[in-house]
Amino acid sequence: WVNPTPFSQSYYAWSCAAVKAADDLKYVFPGRWSIGHDYDVPLEPWPVDRNGRDLSWYRNNATPGSKSYFTVGERADFYGGWYETSDAGFGHWSRYEDMPGRKVWIWDLSRSGEIWVDLLTDRDGQYTEPQAGRLLNQSDHGDFAPGSADRWREQWFPYRGIGPMVQASPHAVLNAAREGASLRLGLFALRPVAEDLVVSAAGTELHRERVVLRAEQIWKKDIDLAGAAPDAPLEVRLGDKLVHATAPGSDDLERPLRFSAPTGGSAEALYLQGRGLERERRLSEALDKYLAAIAAEPLHVRALARAAELRTRAGEPARALDLAGRALAVSMYDPEANYVYGVAARRLGRLVDAKETLGWAARSPQFKGVALVQSAEIAILEKDYERAAESAYAALTGDNHNVNALEVLAVACRLLGRKREHHRVLGWLSDQDPLDHLARFERYLLGRKPRDREACRALVRGELPHETWIEMAAFYHRLGL
């Protein structure tokens, strides 16, 4: 995922699926608490609510209104569901730090929810939505840093024949149920597996055997726990492919989970309110908050820098320069203020000032990549192609996924006549972003071959293809080409 602009953008990413709603559906959603949309309810116990209802069963949600449950309070890489009658289920896996958000959406079980069966879904009855997100709640928006690229991995999967999952990985789904002096295990392979399965109690190995499975193969076994204390914590380990611990609360979070928006009229509160509005793309309201924060505290460097960026985005670089300059008068080496000053100065044609302040910004890990790309673009404007290539390579040392740096580097290599290097950079760019149209257009510009031109044109298939061409034209215009 790429933010190709020189400005901070709203960060909002959720992956949503639809599955069949049924009375025997059990949601396997790790968590101790749930919250609703817009934090319309405080933290509520999950899965059993304050009235003793186990809300993880679809049938127990027959109370007025549609339901959104965002489950929090437990660190887990997986979640999903299980149908009791068919002993089949579904799941989602990603590293928790990549996608900590877990949500289930349930339409009202009354007639007001049933209308959506005909309006939204297929002909197989009502549906419900498991969803995975980069943040904990869909009311939250993050920051997508200027010029940055982000990537993560997630996997949706089916499973069957083992009962409800208690753990999952990209390799297998596990069910584990302790029944007296034995542990009933079930594995469903998501891909070929050949690993030692080890069961331990309180750190002592009780059972080990080789498990070899093909994709979708089921393995079941009852493991004798003789010698283990009834309350001993158990661990099931499938090589380095899956680990499950039964110790109660082993993955519970103790950190505070307070979901609230800042209030009050202090400079810091106004600044934080502005940040929230900016993340929601309510830019004019955000600017008003930043200006109010500056009025309350004229030396608030972060508010000055954010207001300067929004002035630049609004096409007012001169006013932006004044605000960023005031921030630099307070903190000369502030990375954000230097970066915003450099972007605004470039738009005003003050390239010496732009290069100087972007150079200071590039010393900060936060702005290194994007500031160096801006410097590389200025170097191309000034026909200093060697310096442009050096700046682009420097940007890539900190982030070799930097698509903007690769695009500028490709242009610099072409203008320097370095055909082999140009070809290598285009391959690098295509590996990072196979849908990057500029890579194919650059290949055409180097050789001017009709087949390369047609290859580029043939893959511009978006709903608004003219916008793709306009964006590419704007890129070359920024470089003075």
What are these regions (language model features)?
Residues 4-149, 157:
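A contiguous, surface-exposed recognition patch within enzymatic or periplasmic domains that forms
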Residues 165-265, 437-439:
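Long, contiguous interaction/recruitment modules in multidomain scaffold/adaptor proteins
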Residues 320-327, 354-360, 386-394, 419-431, ...:
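Alpha-helical repeat scaffolds
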